């Protein structure tokens, strides 16, 4: 992946800024991961393809109360479904059943072993059409890993404790900066470049096929052997402060 490297006080178009290559980012196409989930009979059988409202009454004489507990009963997703169905009514010709897939992205640091300091920054995907009670079970294996991002480990000498810091800029960034601008990057510039790195990684994950699946959707033979048309929506991205 390449990121643009500007310099404070140096005027140039963004397109003309030198590009710095960052290696070590491993990722899968999120659309392919979701398609596999829809095609799998066991996974698809637990998904809610038809959104709905959920209401609860304490007693016969009490007013009903709307319950908000799942993505597929939320106002936001219901509004998305209504807008899509309204657009489909104006489309001529035969139509397949169309539904919305709610993608949820999460990212955080994780340790790779009980001993040692090996770690990575993991980006994983949940499908919001699956109940949160199922997603909360580790045995459901509903979290799909879609990216492994580079990290750097820092040790505090006084406590001997380790902290995983994301993202990692290779040590060669100083040499690269010196070669192009004749100086080393400031702390603020390094923070900016880290911001560029995380957003560049997200562009790899949610760009291309992801954007096309949002605009045009995909036609997939689902786990019940029925062909359906689905459209993707990124309903949530949960990120730590380091990623902002």
Predicted stretch roles:
Residues 1-244:
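Long, charged/polar, flexible scaffold/linker tracts and peripheral helical/loop segments
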């Amino acid at each position: 992946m390449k990121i643009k490297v500007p310099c404070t006080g140096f005027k140039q178009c963004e397109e003309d800024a030198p590009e710095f290559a960052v290696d070590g980012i491993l990722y899968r196409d999120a659309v392919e991961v979701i398609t596999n989930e829809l095609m799998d009979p066991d996974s698809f059988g637990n998904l809610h393809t038809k959104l709905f409202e959920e209401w609860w009454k304490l007693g016969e004489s009490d007013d009903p109360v709307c319950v908000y507990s799942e993505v597929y009963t939320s106002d936001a997703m219901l509004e998305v479904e209504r807008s899509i169905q309204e657009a489909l009514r104006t489309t001529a010709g035969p139509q397949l059943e169309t539904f919305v897939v709610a993608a949820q992205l999460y990212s955080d640091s994780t340790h790779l072993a009980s001993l040692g300091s090996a770690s990575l920054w993991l980006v994983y995907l949940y499908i919001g059409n699956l109940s949160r009670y199922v997603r909360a079970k580790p045995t459901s294996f509903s979290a799909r890993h879609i990216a492994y991002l580079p990290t750097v480990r820092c040790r505090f000498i006084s406590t001997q404790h380790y902290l995983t810091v994301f993202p990692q800029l290779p040590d060669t960034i100083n040499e690269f900066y010196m070669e192009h601008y004749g100086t080393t990057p400031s702390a603020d510039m390094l923070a900016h470049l880290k911001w560029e790195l995380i957003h560049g990684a997200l562009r790899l994950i949610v760009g291309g096929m992801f954007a096309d699946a949002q605009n045009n959707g995909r036609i997939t033979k689902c786990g019940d052997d029925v062909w359906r048309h689905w459209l993707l929506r990124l309903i949530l991205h949960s990120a730590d402060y380091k990623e902002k």
